[in-house]
């Protein structure tokens, strides 16, 4: 007999009582053939003991008719993840789908599993993850889901379909632009070490310098994507580089804003003394003083291609490649110029 409770039992309660995963409960409810008989019996017994009843959303999950897509996102207040989320919602709406988002401060196996529980209970047809940290790939590969999954951005597990902007290429474009302008030493202010995109951009910077036969000034300074961290890195860069400082590639535009202020306070003019290139092309970049040369990411294309890739998986089509890479674009403004004469 069902025990009295202040709330109706959930799929998570059934999984806990039966000693199985929520994915297994979902498969039993959907009469999936790949469930052992003894496991199926344990789940059905738990359902009877708890008095669990599927709601319409959970039932729709099995038939894939909710027309709702789940999104798990971390660091969603930052420009890149926030722009990606907006693009996903726009693209999903254009296809007649709603988006249910779970925002996480940090993505781990535990937090991702809890987010999946919530989305499964609500009923979704598929999942998109916007989690750029390197730990996201490990978390994704350790969990199985009862629906298709697509990663958006650089954090991807092996074998998981996804869409990303070519961060490595973007960094090579930025660094190459400074080298083409005559600079022979290009410094770098990197993003957080645990972000895959920051690592890819730093690797692209190194690759561009190596292709030109130039030793990169190691290690690069780093920040947390904020203008304040860029400002502090800029102050340190002025001291460390001294007269060798003529060009800086900054891993995002907001940190570049801080670097520009640090240079200005040190009496260095941009671009006359030091050229600066950012990354992202945030809406404010063209209004920086001076307007910022930067690398533009096409978040609209990322959203559109991600939704198409996920819907192809949901509907059993394989028309989209498993991994889609979108090329960034160098936007040249007045924060860069040829290297000043010695």
Task: Name each model-derived stretch.
Residues 56, 74-83, 102-110, 163-173, ...:
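Hinge/beta->alpha junction and helix N-cap segments in small-molecule ligand-binding domains
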Residues 38, 150-152, 165, 189, ...:
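Generic beta-sheet signal
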Residues 123-131, 185-190, 220-221, 241-252, ...:
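Periplasmic-binding protein-like
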Residues 1-9, 68-176, 180:
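Alpha-helical recognition/docking segments in bacterial nutrient-uptake
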